[in-house]
């Protein structure tokens, strides 16, 4: 007899539908009436706010400041950077008129709003902001003394998505995009790699997501970039999620946007630029990485509430005493800190049964649940349940011990989620040396491991193979995973030391 779960279907039965049901059960987001656009509900948005807060400090610690740039980009800006524009052309939303005019339909009697006032030059709703920020950089730069420029903006972007999936692929999504301009090529490359490292460390330490850091192949590179670096995450169905990218743009954008300056030798030079970004897609990765068949499992560092206290009041005469004690415990816990921040603690005072409350917080992924009733008051203990363990597993601990160790418990949960994810990832990456191995691994419809293979194919050969097997090269890993003894490329037979990771992806 199968064990009853809070989420139906389970991961094993239908992973894509399980993912949608976890989001629904945790009350994180929903589809809107605008196709491809989502409503991020308070619980999901609270996670995004915590992500923003941590990342924003990391950006400032690395010398960046926040700014804001226009949502609308003149088409002429995109025409200046043909390769970049072509990469986004099929995803662009275009604004062609500047007002609406009411017209009454004589046949139906209904009033329709008709676009009128055609624009002389259409605008694109930003898919990314390299061009418009580049134009600003050109205005701000005249001398090498004006460099480096290092700005970030938190905003929304628009890319028409044919197959939307909440958090993972939506037409409109929230993100941050960093843009920098430098005096030398070396400085710009250093910036690109620094921010790539920031993303890797953030994903690991805050989201408990272990990523594979690497460089994209030419075929997978950001349009207009000389180099693109990525952090790739493996989720529970073994598909890859690109969790963040950092791009070295060379002088491509500075030449098209005329970002030039008088150098130290008084000659006119073009700046070297970079850009980098992560989005609400990270929330999708978090869900798919950690959650189980009972709902969301949220790492403590981004949990909107880290501890929920559930008063158990079977008798009215003990109700007020239990509630008062729960509030006092919450105040005591909020005075404690976890990674420099006060603990986020909620007392659930709603007039609901204990079971209903418990399962709601299980499905929302709260790291620690505490139940306190009249007997617990007498004993000076609490009933503790951890979200990284089975939902019905509980332990009774002295309240004084809980207060002293609350931050340690949260760190233990954070560490457990990370180590569990590392073990899963490492058990599903394996080497392969022939094309046949690749074809066999990805031939079925079920879950497939990531394969580390020798590769020296051209962008055209890569694209053909990727299309045929419905897979992609996720990256050329940095470090040992991306290098090996000389071996024949699985497609061309040419000897190469380079190793790449092939996988299915979202």
Swiss-Prot record:
<keyword id="KW-0067">ATP-binding</keyword>
<keyword id="KW-0436">Ligase</keyword>
<dbReference type="InterPro" id="IPR045864">
    <property type="entry name" value="aa-tRNA-synth_II/BPL/LPL"/>
</dbReference>
<dbReference type="InterPro" id="IPR017449">
    <property type="entry name" value="Pro-tRNA_synth_II"/>
</dbReference>
<comment type="subunit">
    <text>Homodimer.</text>
</comment>
<dbReference type="GO" id="GO:0006433">
    <property type="term" value="P:prolyl-tRNA aminoacylation"/>
</dbReference>
<dbReference type="GO" id="GO:0004827">
    <property type="term" value="F:proline-tRNA ligase activity"/>
</dbReference>
<dbReference type="Pfam" id="PF09180">
    <property type="entry name" value="ProRS-C_1"/>
</dbReference>
<keyword id="KW-0963">Cytoplasm</keyword>
<dbReference type="InterPro" id="IPR004499">
    <property type="entry name" value="Pro-tRNA-ligase_IIa_arc-type"/>
</dbReference>
<comment type="function">
    <text>Catalyzes the attachment of proline to tRNA(Pro) in a two-step reaction: proline is first activated by ATP to form Pro-AMP and then transferred to the acceptor end of tRNA(Pro).</text>
</comment>
<keyword id="KW-0030">Aminoacyl-tRNA synthetase</keyword>
<comment type="similarity">
    <text>Belongs to the class-II aminoacyl-tRNA synthetase family. ProS type 3 subfamily.</text>
</comment>
<keyword id="KW-0648">Protein biosynthesis</keyword>
<dbReference type="InterPro" id="IPR016061">
    <property type="entry name" value="Pro-tRNA_ligase_II_C"/>
</dbReference>
<dbReference type="InterPro" id="IPR002314">
    <property type="entry name" value="aa-tRNA-synt_IIb"/>
</dbReference>
<dbReference type="GO" id="GO:0005737">
    <property type="term" value="C:cytoplasm"/>
</dbReference>
<dbReference type="GO" id="GO:0005524">
    <property type="term" value="F:ATP binding"/>
</dbReference>
<dbReference type="InterPro" id="IPR006195">
    <property type="entry name" value="aa-tRNA-synth_II"/>
</dbReference>
<dbReference type="Pfam" id="PF03129">
    <property type="entry name" value="HGTP_anticodon"/>
</dbReference>
<dbReference type="InterPro" id="IPR004154">
    <property type="entry name" value="Anticodon-bd"/>
</dbReference>
<dbReference type="InterPro" id="IPR036621">
    <property type="entry name" value="Anticodon-bd_dom_sf"/>
</dbReference>
<dbReference type="GO" id="GO:0017101">
    <property type="term" value="C:aminoacyl-tRNA synthetase multienzyme complex"/>
</dbReference>
<dbReference type="InterPro" id="IPR033721">
    <property type="entry name" value="ProRS_core_arch_euk"/>
</dbReference>
<protein>
    <recommendedName>
        <fullName>Proline--tRNA ligase</fullName>
        <ecNumber>6.1.1.15</ecNumber>
    </recommendedName>
</protein>
<dbReference type="Pfam" id="PF00587">
    <property type="entry name" value="tRNA-synt_2b"/>
</dbReference>
<keyword id="KW-0547">Nucleotide-binding</keyword>
């Amino acid at each position: 007899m199968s064990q009853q779960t809070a989420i139906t279907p389970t991961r094993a039965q239908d992973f894509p539908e399980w993912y949608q049901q976890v989001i629904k059960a945790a009350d994180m987001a929903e589809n809107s009436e605008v196709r491809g656009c989502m409503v991020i509900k308070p619980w999901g948005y609270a996670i995004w706010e915590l992500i923003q807060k941590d990342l924003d400090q990391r950006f400032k610690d690395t010398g960046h400041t926040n700014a804001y740039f226009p949502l609308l980009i003149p088409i002429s800006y995109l025409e200046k950077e043909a390769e970049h524009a072509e990469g986004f052309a099929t995803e662009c939303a275009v604004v062609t008129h500047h007002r609406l005019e009411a017209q009454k339909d004589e046949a139906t009697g209904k009033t329709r709003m008709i676009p009128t006032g055609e624009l002389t030059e259409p605008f694109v709703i930003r898919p990314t902001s390299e061009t418009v920020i580049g134009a600003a950089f050109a205005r701000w730069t005249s001398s090498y003394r004006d460099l480096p420029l290092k700005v970030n903006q938190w905003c929304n972007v628009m890319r028409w998505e044919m197959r939307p999936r909440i958090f993972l692929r939506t037409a409109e999504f929230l993100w941050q995009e960093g843009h920098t301009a430098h005096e030398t090529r070396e400085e710009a490359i250093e910036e690109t790699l620094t921010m790539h490292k920031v993303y890797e460390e953030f994903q690991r330490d805050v989201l408990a997501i272990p990523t594979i850091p690497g460089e994209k192949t030419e075929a997978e590179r950001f349009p207009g970039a000389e180099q693109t670096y990525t952090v790739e995450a493996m989720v529970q169905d073994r598909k890859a999620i690109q969790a963040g990218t950092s791009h070295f743009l060379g002088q491509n954008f500075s030449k098209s946007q005329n970002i030039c300056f008088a150098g130290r030798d008084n000659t006119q030079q073009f700046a070297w630029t970079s850009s980098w970004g992560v989005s609400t897609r990270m929330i999708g990765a978090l869900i798919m990485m950690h959650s189980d068949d009972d709902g969301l499992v949220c790492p403590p560092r981004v949990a909107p509430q880290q501890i929920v206290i559930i008063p158990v009041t079977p008798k009215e005469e003990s109700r007020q005493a239990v509630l008062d004690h729960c509030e006092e415990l919450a105040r005591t816990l909020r005075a404690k800190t976890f990674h420099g921040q006060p603990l986020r603690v909620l007392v659930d005072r709603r007039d609901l049964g204990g079971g209903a409350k418990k399962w709601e917080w299980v499905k929302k992924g709260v790291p620690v649940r505490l139940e306190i009733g009249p007997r617990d008051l007498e004993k000076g203990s609490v009933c503790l349940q951890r979200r990284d363990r089975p939902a019905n597993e509980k332990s009774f601990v002295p309240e004084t011990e809980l207060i002293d160790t609350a931050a340690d418990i949260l760190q233990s949960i954070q560490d457990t989620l990370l180590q569990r994810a590392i073990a899963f990832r490492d058990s599903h990456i394996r080497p392969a040396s022939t094309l046949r191995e690749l074809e066999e691994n990805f031939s079925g419809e079920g879950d497939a491991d990531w394969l580390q293979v020798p590769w020296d194919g051209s962008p055209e050969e890569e694209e053909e193979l990727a299309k045929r097997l419905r897979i992609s090269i996720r990256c050329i890993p940095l470090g040992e995973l991306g290098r090996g003894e000389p071996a024949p490329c699985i497609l061309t037979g040419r000897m190469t030391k380079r190793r790449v990771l092939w996988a299915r992806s979202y």
